[in-house]
Swiss-Prot record:
Protein name: Neuronal acetylcholine receptor subunit alpha-7
Biological process, per Gene Ontology: acetylcholine receptor signaling pathway; calcium ion transport; chemical synaptic transmission; cognition; dendrite arborization; dendritic spine organization; excitatory postsynaptic potential; intracellular calcium ion homeostasis
Topology within the bilayer: Multi-pass membrane protein
Source organism (scientific name): Homo sapiens (Human)
Domain of life: Eukaryota
Length: 502
């Protein structure tokens, strides 16, 4: 089917005429609507009746939560609608004109503001056009970046759930002039945040009475409920702190002779202090509550500090001066008997006699036998030499009851010959033999004192090992209890771990 050129031109002219007529109707309608319109006048048919305004919002994004300054920054589109009695027209008289738009300031609109605004301008909305249809229904959708004051409860940080309120209401109209009604918030266009999960945004309408006026002042409060995502803080704060606190237990496994026990404890304590400062930088300077992670750091620092104190005691035991005195009886009973039995620890050389003692006995016996074989028939000089070496043979090892180590203290069982040796006088014609016997006595006493000192040192060293093992077990239990008890006390700990670490 072919269309003639005349028909095409006729259709084009008709469309242009329709457009020009529609533009003329819009111009005429604008003139009629604003002819006697006063933007200061509340647009109601009866001034005694309140104007109903429906209010809602659309949350697009949680931009920032400043815990230190306690400010919530959100991207929100406000939604306000009402009926303007003076902005109505008959569609048949203005064909094609179903809606008109009025810029800010030309028509009346409610002065609804965010009560708890923290913005420098207070009103952070961008004033857009008001959309009006033929029935007088007005729709106002101003977007804005809202900064609102929000009380940040850091009690369960980093497993916390925050509830930030957005309170909206008319700044100058009371309830008898403007009836503010709430509609549900829209989160269909919400953009997820990397730090916070949006739980919900319930709303509530309330009325408040002031002493100045009898009329109520309605307001609409939306509560932005959000849960902190703990993956970041878990990987950068919690897990390193747990590992550092576990390193503190290695202080009790490090040998006392290494000289690094105190250094390791102090290093761990300084590391925890650094993490504590990192947490303090992002937390508000408030004394209302102590963050959960700060409680964990504080308890861990106390445990590490106590471990350093115990390490000092262990080193004092390990390097105890043998001339400083014996171990007290109650210390020996508690540490060397009860605690050692509980920890299944055995003293060094408990199951067998020290080889050094056996060697000394064998050496003394051999010397006695040899000298007895070489000695001449009983005479004054020979008898003295014979008696002297038998006296040395009488010095044998006997463990004493108060010794911490078996065969650690040398106890002498003097024989009759030794009494003769000590009490007898050397003959006048043998000064060399007298000197030899004096030197032998000196050497024997020196060995006896050395064994006593070694016994005392071994006793204190074993006590230090017992304290190390006991503190290792005790501090391990305390660390596990603090880690599980403090961190799992958060109400949403299981939910946070299952969602963020899964």
């Amino acid at each position: 089917m072919r269309c003639s050129p005349g028909g095409v031109w006729l259709a084009l002219a008709a469309s242009l005429l329709h457009v020009s007529l529609q533009g003329e109707f819009q111009r005429k309608l604008y003139k009629e609507l604003v002819k006697n319109y006063n933007p200061l006048e509340r647009p109601v048919a009866n001034d005694s009746q309140p104007l109903t305004v429906y209010f809602s919002l659309s949350l697009l994004q949680i931009m920032d939560v400043d815990e230190k300054n306690q400010v919530l920054t959100t991207n929100i589109w406000l939604q306000m609608s009402w009926t303007d009695h003076y902005l109505q027209w008959n569609v048949s008289e203005y064909p094609g004109v179903k809606t008109v738009r009025f810029p800010d300031g030309q028509i009346w609109k409610p002065d609804i503001l965010l009560y708890n605004s923290a913005d420098e301008r207070f009103d952070a909305t961008f004033h857009t056009n008001v959309l009006v249809n033929s029935s007088g229904h007005c729709q106002y959708l101003p977007p804005g970046i809202f900064k609102s004051s929000c009380y940040i409860d850091v009690r369960w940080f980093p497993f916390d759930v925050q509830h930030c309120k957005l309170k909206f209401g008319s700044w100058s109209y009371g309830g008898w002039s403007l009836d503010l009604q709430m509609q549900e918030a829209d989160i269909s266009g919400y953009i997820p945040n990397g730090e916070w999960d949006l739980v919900g945004i319930p709303g509530k309408r309330s009325e408040r009475f002031y002493e100045c006026c009898k009329e109520p002042y309605p307001d609409v409060t939306f509560t932005v409920t959000m849960r902190r995502r703990t993956l970041y803080y878990g990987l950068n704060l919690l897990i390193p702190c747990v590992l550092i606190s576990a390193l503190a237990l290695l202080v009790f496994l490090l040998p006392a002779d290494s000289g690094e026990k105190i250094s390791l404890g102090i290093t761990v304590l300084l590391s925890l202090t650094v993490f504590m400062l990192l947490v303090a930088e992002i937390m508000p300077a408030t004394s209302d509550s102590v963050p959960l992670i700060a409680q964990y750091f504080a308890s861990t620092m106390i445990i590490v500090g106590l471990s350093v104190v115990v390490t000092v005691i262990v080193l004092q035991y390990h390097h105890h001066d043998p001339d400083g005195g014996k171990m007290p009886k109650w210390t020996r009973v508690i540490l060397l008997n009860w605690c050692a039995w509980f920890l299944r620890m055995k003293r060094p050389g408990e199951d067998k006699v020290r080889p050094a003692c056996q060697h000394k006995q064998r050496r003394c016996s051999l010397a006695s036998v040899e000298m007895s074989a070489v000695a001449p028939p009983p005479a004054s000089n020979g008898n003295l030499l014979y008696i002297g070496f038998r006296g040395l043979d009488g010095v044998h090892c006997v463990p004493t009851p108060d010794s911490g180590v078996v065969c650690g203290r040398m106890a002498c069982s003097p024989t009759h010959d030794e009494h003769l040796l000590h009490g007898g006088q050397p003959p006048e014609g043998d000064p060399d033999l007298a000197k030899i016997l004096e030197e032998v006595r000196y050497i024997a006493n020196r060995f006896r004192c050395q064994d006593e000192s070694e016994a005392v040192c071994s006793e204190w060293k074993f006590a230090a090992c017992v304290v190390d093992r006991l503190c290792l077990m005790a501090f391990s239990v305390f660390t596990i209890i603090c880690t599980i008890g403090i961190l799992m006390s958060a109400p949403n700990f299981v939910e946070a771990v299952s969602k963020d670490f899964a």
